[in-house]
């Protein structure tokens, strides 16, 4: 009788396992990295003629952190307002592990904190709002940016 009860218990136990989902990846983004990159590129094109205005957050005029804050809001991500606070939150990411949507930070010596922020796209490219005006896509390996890079933060899962 004990073997019979044990056998039924094992059958129920094993049958319960068959109902587990194939993947337990709860943090899978709702769109791929390529789609994220394309959406970022498309959204940033709307900012190509935006003048650089310290404290601004719209396409009528914005600074670098206003640009990242407003652009990332299109992805449902609410960023802190300033470059300094954007750099202090999120998840720290190494340069080798950058993904589309990660924020990249630089010590430029300009502005109240001397910091600058952009959004990583792919293949070492990032988009930022230039102090000369308008969104620009540039390479992290450019001598100017490479020497000023200070870190990255991830806000997208």
Model feature map: region roles:
Residues 27, 31, 51-100:
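Catalytic cysteine-centered active-site loop
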Residues 37, 41, 45, 65-69, ...:
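Extracytoplasmic/secreted envelope proteins and their assembly/folding machinery
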Residues 1-4:
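Positively charged n-region of N-terminal signal peptides that target proteins for export
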Residues 19-37, 42, 77, 92-93, ...:
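Aromatic- and glycine-rich peptidoglycan recognition patches
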């Amino acid at each position: 009788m004990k073997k019979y009860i044990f056998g039924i218990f094992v059958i129920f136990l094993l049958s319960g396992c068959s109902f587990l989902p194939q993947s337990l990846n709860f943090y899978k983004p709702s769109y791929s990295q390529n789609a994220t990159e394309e959406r970022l590129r498309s959204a940033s094109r709307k900012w190509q003629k935006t003048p650089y205005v310290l404290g601004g957050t719209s396409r009528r005029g914005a600074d670098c952190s206003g640009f990242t804050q407003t652009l990332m809001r299109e992805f449902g991500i609410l960023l802190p307002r300033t470059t300094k606070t954007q750099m202090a939150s999120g998840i720290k990411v190494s340069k080798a592990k950058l993904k589309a949507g990660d924020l990249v930070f630089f010590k430029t010596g300009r502005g109240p904190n001397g910091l600058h922020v952009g959004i990583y796209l792919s293949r070492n490219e990032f988009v930022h709002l230039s102090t000369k005006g308008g969104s620009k896509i540039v390479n992290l390996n450019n001598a100017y940016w490479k020497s000023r890079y200070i870190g990255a933060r991830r806000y997208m899962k």
